Amino acid sequence: MYPTVLITFEINENCKVSHPKLQETMSFTVTIDGSGHQFDIEENETVLDAALRQNVGLPYGCRNGRCGACAAGLLSGEVSYHGAPPALQEVGAGKCLPCQGFAASDLVISVREVETPEEIEVKLLPVRVHAVDHLTHDVVRLKLKLPENQRLQFRAGQYLDFLLADGRRRAFSIANAPFDDEFIELHIRHVDGGKFTDWVFNQMKERSILRIQAPLGTFVLEEDSERPMIFMGGGTGFAPLKGQIEQAFRSQMAQPIHLYWGVRAQRDLYLPELPKQWAREHANFTFVPVLSEPDADWHGRIGFVHEAVLADFPDLSGFDLYMAGPPPMVKAGREACLAAGMPEAHMHFDSFDYADDSGANPDT
């Protein structure tokens, strides 16, 4: 027999007893102003991850806090971050970045919701390198092949992530249109100091096997719009625009379609004949290349690409804009187009961020 021991506790309101295994994970509710849509969020997931998990369509781009595509108005509640996302200061007071923000309370946010077709599933897939074409001194075109009898479902303008062996990811826009799905086409620019792009340019061989996650992103063509469309690209920002324009042709979208492609010099127009061919074949399409550091024999448009757009269309209130390229170009273009009367709901953009291999940013 063991002796009976009576233990008494004196508990007051200042006493807290906890055990790690007994603690519950905190959860909150996020409400989208206007639509009233709500979703739950756990304390260990970002606002964007919680939304995607529950098929709530929030806009996003880089997913690393740099491009600002996901920016939302924070109407009530508290959002915390692990570090300071680079774009947080740029988006201004009263805003949050759902791709990096964690809920510290119930939230009410103001954001443009986007369509999330549930039938298009994000998948982890193996791919085989079918072709590596060096288009210019610093751009290659990759063609990737999925396993036999498989096709990737996606919307024009989305991107994929390469999943590297060390756990890092590298993001690249899909350059082909959804109807043309025998191969996945990517346009990859060499990044100084980027180990992945060094490998792509110097060592990647046909038949190499890689792993991808796709499709990702909300930079997609809105095929139900009848407004004239402006596509503005910088460098390899042409890649997602190519897929969107080809899809627009396939869908017989009859409104005017204008492509402005900004690069430094003429050699940086890495597929110069393709948009010229589109202009010959489609009466509603125009192509305007713009050089910021023009060659001596260049007789076309010069300067910044967004300035060329505004020179041709000073009033953008009746247009849709699709814009992809480096963050400075996207930032300048967005501000200029808003000032020219373009409604924010008509503006779609994808801001490319180039990684060094010291961090987790994509070699887009």
Give residue spans per PLM region.
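A short, basic/flexible loop-to-alpha-helix module at the beginning of a structural domain
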Residues: 215-225
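Ferredoxin-reductase
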Residues: 121-209, 226-227, 263-265, 290-294
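Reductase modules of NAD(P)H-dependent flavoproteins
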Residues: 22-107, 256-364
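Short, surface-exposed secondary-structure boundary micro-motifs
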Residues: 75-78, 112-114, 165, 215
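Short, conserved phosphate/pyrophosphate- and ester-handling motifs at nucleotide-, phospho-/glycolipid
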Residues: 157, 237, 326
